[in-house]
From Swiss-Prot:
Protein name: Small ribosomal subunit protein uS8
Species per Swiss-Prot/TrEMBL record: Sorangium cellulosum (strain So ce56) (Polyangium cellulosum (strain So ce56))
GO CC, any one term: ribonucleoprotein complex
InterPro entries linked: Ribosomal_uS8, Ribosomal_uS8_CS, Ribosomal_uS8_sf
Annotated family: Belongs to the universal ribosomal protein uS8 family.
Gene encoding the protein: rpsH
One function term, GO molecular function aspect: rRNA binding
């Protein structure tokens, strides 16, 4: 049984990017779809689609590469996890690589990037960092 599905999704994305795969599939859930949509809107992945087939629904995440197949994602880190939740106020949201990366937060208004949370002055649970 998987205890942290978000960490599993982030690990699959990281491993696929390091192996230079075009896409990866993860079991679908609303929170994973929301994280993937934020990664897409911030320019870290090219596309995300929910696919149905035999068995449970899956999210197909299409990775984004630049020149020389350089991945848009250099690193991913799960911050808050089931055994250690991490909460931050809006004025304490960390800047990832001086603003080159993003943090994803779970707030009372749903999942959002660190930039949106700072703009709306909302704190919450710090889900992960991507750079």
């Amino acid at each position: 049984m998987m205890t942290d599905p978000i960490a599993d999704m982030l690990t699959r994305i990281r491993n696929a990017a390091l192996a230079r795969h075009d896409r990866t599939e993860v079991p679908a859930s609303r929170i994973k779809a929301a994280v993937a949509e934020i990664l897409k809107s911030e320019g870290f992945i090219a596309d995300v689609r929910e696919t149905e087939g035999e068995g449970p629904k899956k999210l197909t995440i299409v990775l984004k590469y630049g020149r020389d197949r350089q991945s848009a994602i250099d690193g991913v880190r799960r911050v808050s996890r089931p055994g250690r939740r991490v909460y931050v106020r809006h004025d304490r949201i960390p800047r990832v690589f001086s603003g080159l990366g993003i943090s994803i937060l779970s707030t009372s208004r749903g999942l959002m990037s660190d930039r949106d949370a700072r703009r709306l002055k909302m704190g919450g649970e710090l889900i992960c960092e991507v750079w």
